[in-house]
Structures are given as structure tokens and as C-alpha cells.
């Protein structure tokens, strides 16, 4: 199953993306979700197939959501996924005694 998909970036929340079928655009996305998502900025289009790898999403889930509800919402990564925490000794290295 091959789907041509448009991906929109949220202006409200960094790292939040909305996948929709290109032919439907944003028509099938519920209004409350669009309000929470904020202004949708078209990022790019891509062809999705079951064999395609996505960096942060399971392709099977994305395709299933597109078929069942007409969209897939990608949430931003949890803070721990993108912020490296430094060891305590490095944080205190330049502290005055």
C-alpha cells in the first residue's frame, strides 16, 4: 500500500508534525486538534510505503492512522530524548570554592 502524504509542522509546538493524505489535505483533521496544533505550516510531501523507515515513527502505525482516521499526529520527543544531562562533577567544575 503506497500513500502520498503531506507533512505539516506546528507553529505552536516545536517538534509536532501532522501527517495527512495529500489528496485530503487537512479536511479530515478534527477542529479541536487543529486548534491545539495551531497554524499548520506545510513542511514537505513524501511517498509512504510499508518498507519505508521513519526516524521517530512506526511506519505501520502511521499508515494505519492515515487509513482509519485520515491523519497521524507525531508528538515532540520527550525532553530526555534530546537533552543530554551532564555529570554533576562537570556542572560544578568552575564553581568558586
Swiss-Prot record:
UniProt domain YcgL: residue ranges: 3-87
InterPro entries membership: YcgL-like_sf, YcgL_dom
Gene3D superfamilies, A to Z: YcgL domain
Protein name, entry field: YcgL domain-containing protein PFLU_1517
HAMAP family membership: UPF0745
UniProt superkingdom: Bacteria
